[in-house]
Amino acid sequence: IALNLVKRGITDSTMFDLSKNVLQPTTALYKKNILLTRGRFRPVTKVHIDMIENGRKAFMEENDVKEEDVSVVFELTLKDLTADGKILVQDFLDRADLLSSLGYTVMVSNYLKHYKMVEYLAPIARGKLIGVILGVYNLNTIFEEKYYGNLPGGLLEAFGRGFGHHMKIYVYPAFNVEDGEIYDLNNIEIAPNLVGLLNYMRDNDKIKEIKEFNPKLLHIMSDDVLSKIKAGASSWEEDVPESVGKAIKFYELFGYQKKEIKV
């Protein structure tokens, strides 16, 4: 029901806690320091957990951020729940259940673009810090001007509307398959005319790199894990948390099929 409310545009977002209770973001996140990570999580992998745990450590280092006032949220957008224009309700519920089983709150929203989500959360947070954890390749997308063609002021308008609030982006590195090196905030490749903007944001404490991470996990990609599951390979189990692996096998999620035991 809650998902349908978002789907029909009656509400812009809804949340589920670890007990699968439906929450109203305006109440659950009121005056909270909010740490948000966005993605498909199909399925949630070890690298996702490393990202959120080390992103949280960086978030907790900020001034005036206290443990009791922090809400960690995994967000799924409606676009990430569609296939051929149709909402995959069961697929969403499966992903929400997996994240909830790990102890995280799940949000589903209509906000595809990051600045729109920050605009939505800012009045709820009431001056508290909003942290957004992004993989470095997603940060590349934020710095693509074509992403903001619908705004009269383009990229600068979006950045003003998003970063003008009390918010910060925490950037998680990636493995560069082309050269085998770690790709991070220090060697990110963006358009030359936007390098100054990136430096401005770094100088004004709007972007921070996540320095603690497990480099052995950076090769894990959700799409690759999903392909392994569907292909019947067993190596995917090494890429997900143990509880997630057990749930995928028990409930036969994401195309997993139990192997028949021959007698």
Regions of interest found by a model, annotated:
Residues 1-263:
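Nucleotidyltransferase catalytic core that binds NTPs
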